[in-house]
């Protein structure tokens, strides 16, 4: 059993080591080949994750297979902190994504999104001007609205209203239905200058391709709807990852006890069993 737990920890950490290689390579590739600032923004976190997994895996591998007790202790301490971190992140993700959803519009295939429907913490992230300028730049570079226009440019208004748009397309690429603007094409609308609008997005809308509704509250809400969906998926993956970490940690504790017992035996009898 002693050998089994040490060998199992070694095998699991060898698999983690193999996993860290493509993650690290992907981060390096992004830093060198990323065509936009948004793509390059991910390189440092990905590289850091790859290096972290590699170092932890090597520590666990050496500590268990070579029976280096102090190194295995450090490995288990880091694993314990990682389990706490993943648990807290998972709970936090569920808490901040429990609010907010698109609002169905009568007679329309798409939904519209309001910033106030989402959690206060998420709202503060996008209402920060510095944060939003970076996000806005990424949205423009992704050509989310240009692709929408190219896809539906010749579609008549009645057909366009029946389309199922994504949260970003609905929030960033067209004005709110409350504005009552006249449809020309998916990203070009004629403003109604005679009416008064309570929705501030109606004044923010601009037909210029680099502006559109990228500064609208609806665009920020559309982004948060995407974030909400993504975080819920990440939280589910985190639960699986957490179970894996707990299993590895438990087996690692067995290996640590084995190492301590062997060290004690060695001090008493002069050799390891």
Curated annotation (Swiss-Prot):
Topological domains on the Extracellular side lie at 29-45, 97-235
Q: What is its main location?
A: membrane
Write down the InterPro entries for this protein, in alphabetical order. TET_plant, Tetraspanin/Peripherin, Tetraspanin_CS
Q: Where are the transmembrane segments?
A: 8-28, 46-66, 76-96, 236-256
List the Cytoplasmic topological domains. Answer: 1-7, 67-75, 257-273
Where does this one sit in the cell? Membrane
The source's superkingdom equals Eukaryota
Topological type in the membrane: Multi-pass membrane protein
Name its GO BP terms in alphabetical order. Answer: auxin-activated signaling pathway; defense response to Gram-negative bacterium
Query: Keyword annotations for this protein?
Result: Glycoprotein, Membrane, Transmembrane, Transmembrane helix
Q: Which residues are glycosylated?
A: 192
Q: Which PROSITE patterns match?
A: TM4_1 (PS00421)
**UniProt-listed Pfam families:** Tetraspanin (PF00335)
Annotated GO CC locations: Golgi apparatus; plasma membrane; plasmodesma; vacuole
**Role summary:** May be involved in the regulation of cell differentiation.
Q: Which family does it belong to?
A: Belongs to the tetraspanin (TM4SF) family.
Q: What is this protein called?
A: Tetraspanin-8
Organism in which the protein naturally occurs: Arabidopsis thaliana
Q: What gene is behind this protein?
A: TET8
């Amino acid at each position: 059993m002693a050998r089994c737990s040490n060998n199992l920890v070694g095998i699991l950490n060898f698999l983690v080591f193999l996993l860290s290689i493509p993650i690290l390579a992907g981060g390096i590739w992004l830093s060198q080949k990323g065509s936009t600032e948004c793509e390059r923004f991910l390189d440092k976190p990905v590289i850091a994750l790859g290096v972290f997994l590699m170092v932890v895996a090597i520590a666990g591998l050496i500590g268990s297979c070579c029976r280096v007790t102090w190194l295995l202790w450090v490995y288990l301490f880091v694993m314990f902190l990682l389990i706490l971190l993943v648990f807290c992140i998972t709970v936090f993700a569920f808490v901040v994504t429990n609010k907010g959803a698109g609002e169905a519009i009568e007679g329309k295939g798409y939904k519209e999104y309001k910033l106030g429907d989402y959690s206060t913490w998420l709202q503060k992230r996008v209402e920060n001007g510095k944060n939003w300028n970076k996000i806005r730049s990424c949205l423009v570079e992704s050509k989310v609205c240009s692709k929408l226009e190219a896809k539906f440019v010749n579609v008549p208004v009645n057909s366009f209203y029946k389309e199922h748009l994504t949260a970003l397309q609905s929030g960033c690429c067209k004005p709110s239905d409350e504005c009552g603007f006249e449809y020309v094409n998916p990203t070009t609308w004629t403003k109604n200058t005679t009416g008064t609008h309570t929705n501030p997005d109606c004044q923010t809308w601009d037909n210029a391709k680099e502006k559109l509704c990228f500064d609208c509250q609806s665009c920020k809400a559309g982004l948060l709807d995407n974030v909400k969906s993504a975080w819920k998926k990440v939280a589910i993956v985190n639960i699986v990852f957490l179970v894996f970490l707990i299993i590895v940690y438990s087996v690692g504790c067995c290996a640590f006890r084995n190492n301590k017992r062997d060290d004690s035996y060695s001090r008493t009898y002069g050799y390891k069993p």
